[in-house]
A protein has these predicted regions:
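C-terminal end-helix/capping segment
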Residues: 75, 80-93
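Beta-rich strand-turn-strand
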Residues: 49-73
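Flexible, glycine/small-residue-enriched loop-and-beta-strand segment within the central core
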Residues: 1-58, 84, 92-93
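Residues that flank catalytic or metal-binding motifs in active/ligand-binding sites
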Residues: 16, 67, 77
Length: 93
């Protein structure tokens, strides 16, 4: 498996059963990924129960990820994101 780093900022709240995937369990061992994308969760983020975060995404500052969401791409700062795939529900002031 190829593993990649995770960066978690300050004041990040992670609820139970959150999964953060950084590995690529590709069965063809001769074709490993050269780039190991970093998964980044910035400061003041709240991640609800049963959220799945895929490798290489960035979740911006002051963001809420709703329970059961699947984060497949970057989520900007100051938003609430929900769903599968996660999308912006609203912006926070």
């Amino acid at each position: 498996m190829d593993y990649a780093p995770i960066i978690i900022g300050d004041q990040v709240n992670i609820a139970p059963k959150v999964e953060i995937y950084t590995a690529s369990p590709h069965s063809i061992t001769d074709h490993r990924l050269v780039a190991r994308p970093i998964t980044t969760i910035k400061d003041n983020v709240w991640i609800g129960c049963n959220v799945c975060i895929l490798r290489g995404v960035t979740i911006g500052h002051n963001t809420i990820i709703g329970a059961g969401s699947v984060v497949t791409h970057d989520i900007p700062a100051n938003v609430i994101a929900v769903g599968n795939p996660a999308h912006i529900l609203c912006k926070l002031n």
